[in-house]
Each structure stands twice: as structure tokens, then as C-alpha cells.
């Protein structure tokens, strides 16, 4: 079975908006009093500013555990303090161009819906490396890409001629070995 799975996103564009906040970790944290940045940046990947891709950062500190400076923190801090502008706040001319290399992740939490606790698993771009760039790729199609190893075990097909949805099981546990996959139990 494959030992490492590919999970990469590449996002280039103009900083559209953000809700980043500079905070300090509390007394009960592993490293109390540590400054960190949390929040979301939204990147416009097309020139028309219609394809907006959010990237969430949970906990970004100024240095790595090794003590080496964290360039992502520096970039995010420049966004927080206004050194780098955003399209919505400062206009297109002052909005910073960014490249983000991230990964897909899950934001899982429980919510109370109609008196019943329910698990919500929302997919999002989580963290990664953020760099200020001077130019963007001319081809808008390559500004927002992802590579991921995945197994599709079910798809829903809609046939408008019969107005019904039906489910097609593509890969099941019983036939994965015949396709060259190790069984994932």
C-alpha cells in the first residue's frame, strides 16, 4: 500500500480580503504567552475577481520549534498590520499578490440542529506557506490547482431525461484488490 498520500493545493492571486487576527496564547496552552496569527485569507485567482479561494490558518507562530523564523508568520503579520493591502479595503492597485502552497483539510465540529447533535465535516484549504510575489501566472487556470490521491467510492448521477438521481458505486472494498489497491480496512 502507498505510504504517503499526495495532498497539495497551489493558489496564486490577489489578496481579496482577510479576517486574520494577531493573538497571544493563554495560560493553559503548551507555550503560554506565545504570539500567533489565526484566521482566513481570501485569494482572488482570476482577473475578474470572481473566483475567491479561502485559506484558513489555525495557529501560525513567529518561529518554528527549532527557533528558525517563520516566513509565513511575517507575511501574515504584514497583512494584519496593513503593510500588504487587500482588494476590498485598499483597491486593486494596493492589493498584494500572493502564492499559497497549502493542503486540503477538514474542519470538523458538532452542531445542534433541531435538538440533535450532528457532526459537520467541512473541507477547506488549511495552512501552508504564503509568499508575496511580484507577478502572477498569465494562465488563470493554473493559479488554483490541487493534486490529491483519493478513492472515489460513490458518485451521484443525475439524468434529466428521467428526473431521478441514482447512485453508482465505483469502487467497493471487495473489488479494490483487483484494481491494484490494498484493501483499506
Predicted regions mapped to residue ranges:
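OB-fold and OB-like single-stranded nucleic-acid-recognition modules
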Residues: 1-185
Amino acid at each position: 500500500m502507498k505510504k504517503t498520500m499526495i495532498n497539495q493545493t497551489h493558489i496564486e492571486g490577489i489578496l481579496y480580503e482577510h479576517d486574520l487576527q494577531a493573538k497571544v496564547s493563554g495560560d493553559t496552552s503548551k507555550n503560554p504567552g506565545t504570539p500567533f496569527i489565526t484566521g482566513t485569507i481570501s485569494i482572488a485567482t482570476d482577473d475578474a475577481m470572481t473566483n475567491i479561494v479561502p485559506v484558513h490558518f489555525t495557529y501560525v507562530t513567529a518561529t518554528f520549534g527549532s527557533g528558525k523564523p517563520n516566513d509565513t508568520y511575517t507575511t501574515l503579520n504584514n497583512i494584519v498590520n496593513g503593510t500588504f493591502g487587500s482588494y476590498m479595503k485598499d483597491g486593486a492597485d494596493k492589493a498584494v499578490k500572493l502564492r499559497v502552497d497549502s493542503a486540503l483539510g477538514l474542519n470538523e465540529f458538532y452542531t445542534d440542529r433541531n435538538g440533535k447533535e450532528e457532526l459537520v465535516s467541512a473541507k477547506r484549504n488549511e495552512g501552508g506557506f504564503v509568499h508575496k510575489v511580484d507577478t502572477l501566472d498569465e494562465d488563470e487556470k493554473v493559479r488554483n490547482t490541487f493534486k490529491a490521491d483519493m478513492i472515489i467510492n460513490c458518485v451521484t448521477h443525475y439524468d434529466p431525461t428521467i428526473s431521478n438521481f441514482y447512485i453508482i458505486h465505483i469502487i467497493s472494498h471487495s473489488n479494490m484488490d483487483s484494481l491494484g489497491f490494498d484493501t483499506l480496512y
